[in-house]
């Protein structure tokens, strides 16, 4: 974004002295402060406390490090050259800060929900009754979740509170677009972007319901032609107590919305929120924790963690130059951006839609998978532009240590290959010494249940989901990041598929075996060259839907004869397999569009138990009995695979037994 301003920004950075300002946290309001689990002691760290509240920031508009925030100078609460924002926060910290390890895990919450403690430690995300095995707490980390999304929806969501913008006191209007594919018939849909119920972003209400620029279209796939739905057939309305009532946050369609179709709406909105301040909030809280003598969460080192939407947020944070605080100091020492694929997002635009992602059948053609994709500079052969994610951080000498980690899903669902190849698709791209790229084979966007089961509702696929857990890889990544920043101990080298050894191939060369009854996708997600109007690279989108230019190359990981990926961090389930973990899952016919991929999921396709079973079904993959002479043979190989992961520091020694237990469970499930 804002590529043609990039050179000017870098010149400003290099020519201006740092302004004599502190990290701009101006006050902290505490809503609650309680001992975790009634003062339970966690290893040598001792007791922890959980603090909730709101933190307030003030951003000087003249500071060069704030000038990339869209509409900051138009904020209605601009006073004395500064704009105030605030964020909800949750902090879990050692009661005695001196007993902590000095490192903070700063969680960028996904749509307002902070869940990293539950994911890594296995207990309650809010530590209400159960801390799991308390790995983070036993190891002395401070964990903070900080609101950054202005429209985070649903109860308990951590919010970012930002002013609206006006130009010279006048209301700003514009066009906003949304889309979705339903899994069941509905008479009306909400405006906004919602995932799994009320999780998502509320976005903007319609400002002018009768404006002729408001349009509704339908099509059957991403690249299909749109069909305009006559204006008399729909209205901005909502059913209340059985009565259809005008409403500025719903669309009602006569005859109803059908499943398996992409409905896209464009409508007039007003009063944009200065959403880009959320990027500065993460920056300034990190610097506050490291430099303020009275910080409520003191830290020597800060590692930002983001999953999916918030992983994309961190990629955008780096690209837009937010890792230098207002004094030019490094804000984040480490970044762990997980399952972000090649994406960034709608985080710093006028009328920003931060919840929007880029799924197979929704949030299509949004400013998500947009150039540049690689950390080091790359050239777009079509536009001639040259840029990389780390250009600004490099110019300011604030490049953090970075893990870009992804699963099998992101190569098909998030255009992940673009982070490691040239924009023309001819070769692998070089990566920074401060970057590691990790591809966790066989895993999906979020871990599925065990025993394996199909997704439900909007996520019902044709096959069971991948049940492989990410938890233990997360623990090792956090430990490796801490060692890298703290003592310069190099983490495991990058592990991902490459063009050079044909483990990353064009979609047409993908060699998945012909498994009876298993349908394969005909396409994969891609990065597109989009044009939202003459000022969109300054954050103002005026053409909706955008003009779509030539797509970037589509590459996917190559597979072996079983259909499992050949390169990356290979789970024991991949190197000693009992099943195929296909990198995609198609929508179940019951929810419509069965030729399209379902969001987030990988397919679990078990092997036949015996050779005769395999031969009867026509399955080309060897059966379990043909691979392993008995249970002990399998478990010996599985144990060796686990030990290899421990040796390479992909998992921690203390998690070895948990992996071995899982291997036993998987054998029982596969052979029952």
Where are these regions (language model features)?
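C-terminal His-loop and adjacent cap/lid subdomain of alpha/beta-hydrolase
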Residues: 24-672
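Sec/Tat signal peptide C-region and signal peptidase I cleavage site
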Residues: 19-23
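N-terminal secretory signal peptides that target proteins for export/translocation
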Residues: 1-5
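Bacterial N-terminal signal peptides
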Residues: 7-18
